[in-house]
Each structure stands twice: as C-alpha cells, then as structure tokens.
Amino acid sequence: MILVTGGLGFIGAHTVRALASLGQRCLAATRSPVPDPAPFADLGDMVTVVQAGAADLSSLRRAGDGRRVSGIVHLAAPAPGPPGERAAFVRASVDALLNLLDGAAAWGVPRVFLASSLGVYQGVPDTPYREDARLRQLPIDPIPAAKNAIELLAAVVTQSAGPQVVNLRIATIWGPGNTSRAPVVPNLVHAAVRGEPVQQPVYAADGSDLCYVADCARAIALLQCAETLHHSTYNVGCGRPASPAQVRDALLRSIPGAALELTPGRDPGGPGHDTWLDITRLRQDTGYQPAYDLDRGLREYIGWLRGGHPY
C-alpha cells in the first residue's frame, strides 16, 4: 500500500488514481476531515482515505500502523503564510519530513518520494534545467527555499541509514482540480470558459514547462513503481517550454472569440528567457513520455469546467 500525503489535493488526487491504474493500493492522507461521501468510491478497495497530517506524528502513525505501507509519496505542503509567520511554515515542513522518515523506518518502507519544485532552479542561468545543476543560494520565495532545504536535510538524515529518498522537482502543473488561478494556464482557461477578464498581467513571451496534471501524476506513479532508480532527484514535467501566447492560441482553437488579453514581451522581473526541465533521467528510468499536448489537455480541462466543476 502506498501512502500519499496530500492525497486529496490537486496533484495528490491525480497521483492516487495513477497509482491505482498501475495496480497499487493507496492510502490517501488528508489533514482535513474525510469528506462524505468519500472520494475515490469508484476505485473500491484500491484506495483508503484517512485523516492524517504529515506534521502530526501520532496521526500519521495511526494511519499507517498495521496497514503494510510499502511506499511513501509526500505531496502535502503547508501554506507559507505571511512573512511574519514563516517560522511555523518551516517548522511544519521539517516536522513532516522527520515524521515520514520515522514512519518509513517503522514500516520498513524502502523508498520515500518528496515533492520539490522547479522553483529551486531560480537563478540557474542555463536551460533546460538539469538535476545536477548547481543551485544558487538566493533570497528566493519561501516555497522553493523550503523545498531546497528539505532536499538537503533529507540527504543528511538518511546519509548512512534509512530509506532511499527521491526528490521530485515538479514543473508548473495545470488541469482539472487546480484551485489556484495564479498559474498561467488556469488563469487563461477560466477567463475563456467563464468569459471573465484575465487576472493580473500575463506576459505573452514567458515560456515555461507547463505539464498537464495527468502526465505529472503518471510520471510520479511510474517512479514509485520502478524496481530500480539510478538517481536521488528527478525532474517531473513535459520537458519543453510553452508560452502564454501559445496557450492563448490553443484556447482560441477550442473557444473561438474568447477575449484573452496578454501583455506583450517578457516580465521585466522574470529570468528573461524560457525555463523548462530536462526530463532525460525520468524517461530513461521509467519510459515516461508526456501523453498530453496543449490542445488535448485544454480540451479535457475545458470539458471539466463546463461539466459544472468550479476548478
């Protein structure tokens, strides 16, 4: 049974389904009370949903003890909060890491996957970003900073004993279930489907690795199911850049006439070039290939929203 923290979240819920499709029974953990009716009812006994927070050792151990947990995929993440409350964010992030490693030791789990971020590459000059790039220690945003720190702490804790820890440096993910309008794709898709204005300036030329959530989930599931992994860090994305202008053009093929106003050029506060991930390691060790291009993913996403889902 694979424990997936954040198992009802955006990426987590899709990952649970991807694992189940590969024959893996899942324990989907959520900090919130389990909804009624429980999610994943269509998957029967392949998925069990439990209330457990990774930063709460007692609830985590109650969830996993006696359940033959054989793998851990840690996708839950605390919200950073305002600048004056960042200590609580850091504490929750570190507590979750240590609790999961404690659980892995108690349950005999050989491998723990930790969700990291494309953001750890901030300041790296060369693209595509490779896992062996030398990361820059910059005053970066709190979430990438925490992800970078957790990667280092996990390596220290498991250096001589403990499970294999695998870092997942995840691209910008989009698709059904994303509650945030901040990323480029949900912003433009909601504007097109709802007939609303585009929120905030979106610079037309800023290309980045925009990976459809089903592809991301399948990549994580393939890594979890791989017998052997040759690396401790994997980029997870589609391995190519796409710009907001390309997203707009693809949307107009599905929703002709949608009013999608973009700001010309690149964000003056951005890196000044396209950013995307090298996914060679992922491909070599799992055989992964993205199944969704922009047009296919957008058609599915549009259909989801038009089917009555709020996000």
Predicted stretch roles:
Residues I2-L22:
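N-terminal Rossmann NAD(P)H-binding glycine-rich loop of SDR-like oxidoreductase domains
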Residues P78-P80, L118-T127, A171-W174:
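Active-site segment of SDR-like NAD(P)-dependent oxidoreductases
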Residues T127, L152-S208, V213-D215, A221, ...:
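NAD(P)-dependent short-chain dehydrogenase/reductase
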Residues T5, A29, I72-A76, V112-L118, ...:
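SDR active-site strand-loop-helix element
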Residues A29-V34, A54:
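N-terminal Rossmann-fold cofactor-binding loop
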Residues E196, Q200-Y311:
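C-terminal substrate-binding subdomain of Rossmann-fold SDR/epimerase-dehydratase oxidoreductases
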Residues A87, R91, D95-N99, A106, ...:
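Catalytic helix-loop patch of NAD(P)-dependent Rossmann-fold dehydrogenases
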Residues Q51-A92:
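NAD(P)H-binding glycine-rich loop region in Rossmannoid oxidoreductase-like domains
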